[in-house]
Amino acid sequence: MKIGVIMGGISSEREISLQSGKSIIENINKEKYEVLPIVIDKKEDIINKSKGIDFALLALHGQFGEDGTVQSVLQTLGIPYSGCGPLSSAMCMDKDVSKSVLEANGIRTAPWINLRKGDNIDFNKINELGYPVVVKPTHGGSSVATFIVKEEKEIENCVSEAFKWDSEVMIEKFIKGDEITCPVYNNKMLPVIAIKPKAEFFDFTSKYQDGGAEEIVVELEAELHKEVEKMALETYKALKCEVYSRVDMIVTEEGVPYILEINTLPGMTKNSLIPKSAAALNIGFSELIDMIIQDSLKISR
């Protein structure tokens, strides 16, 4: 079977995607699969470079990769691919939409407002959220252009900076607590990982620099584990995820979990969280890649 490992892309997360692709190529079972690296430099590459492959193993992150666009193209070309479908990918990439779906399903997430380019900033609504707030691109990833804002005078600059990366910007109540990530694979939660960043929050540097954060598999207290698992699985289901995704949460000092966001194509670098979680179940990286390929092939699209 000829596997195209699709990486690169045109988003702000291109370099991380290339790292994910490289790690996958290094660890995939080459006795079982013929592997073709496919680097996307421009949008039409997904059509021109995917010809002749039997399966697309997606290592893309961010817009045009994680937002359902590439998934739709591959589906149109009749090429099976890894992970979530177009609708789920698009919903999870758009934090305003995903949070609206969560809220409609009674799943706890921080209150927020969403701005489009040209909208006036409603400072009264921001005051209702209460400072500090988080300002970030609505369709962003890897915490690029994400700011914790503690007072009103900082808002305009941070919103302007976030708009450099996206056509929409989210302003969300900052929830103080411990960040955890909950990988979900085929409707089952894998071991939870606690994230203790050296910075104020789990920013770009913390995520991708060696030693930027301490990431450890944790055993949560029984009641909290039960609630976290319920929320992770309900989120996976509500947003129509398939095969695997990563549900990120924040747990307050009082032990109340909130959904932060959902990653439909989580990182697959040596520092990445899903391989760490799978390793806690004695599932090696090569085996995990094989599972993702085989389970994705079972989906009828």
Swiss-Prot record:
One GO-annotated biological process of the protein: cell wall organization
Residues where Mg(2+) 2 binds: E261, N263
GO MF entries: ATP binding; D-alanine-D-alanine ligase activity; metal ion binding
Keyword annotations: ATP-binding, Cell shape, Cell wall biogenesis/degradation, Cytoplasm, Ligase, Magnesium, Manganese, Metal-binding, Nucleotide-binding, Peptidoglycan synthesis
Localization: Cytoplasm
Catalytic activities: 2 D-alanine + ATP = D-alanyl-D-alanine + ADP + phosphate + H(+)
Annotated residues for binding of Mg(2+) 1: D248, E261
UniProt pathway annotation: Cell wall biogenesis; peptidoglycan biosynthesis
Cofactor note: Binds 2 magnesium or manganese ions per subunit.
InterPro entries per UniProt: ATP-grasp (IPR011761), ATP_grasp_subdomain_1 (IPR013815), D-Ala_lig_Van_CS (IPR000291), D_ala_D_ala (IPR005905), Dala_Dala_lig_C (IPR011095), Dala_Dala_lig_N (IPR011127), PreATP-grasp_dom_sf (IPR016185)
Occurrences of domain ATP-grasp (ranges): 99-294
Major location (coarse): cytoplasm
One Gene Ontology term, aspect cellular component: cytoplasm
Binding positions for ATP per the UniProt entry: 126-181
Record has Transcription as a keyword: no
NCBIfam families tied to this protein: D_ala_D_alaTIGR (TIGR01205), PRK01372.1 (NF002378)
UniProt record similarity statement: Belongs to the D-alanine--D-alanine ligase family.
Biological role: Cell wall formation.
Protein name: D-alanine--D-alanine ligase
Organism: Clostridium beijerinckii (strain ATCC 51743 / NCIMB 8052) (Clostridium acetobutylicum)
Upper lineage: Bacteria, Bacillati, Bacillota, Clostridia, Eubacteriales
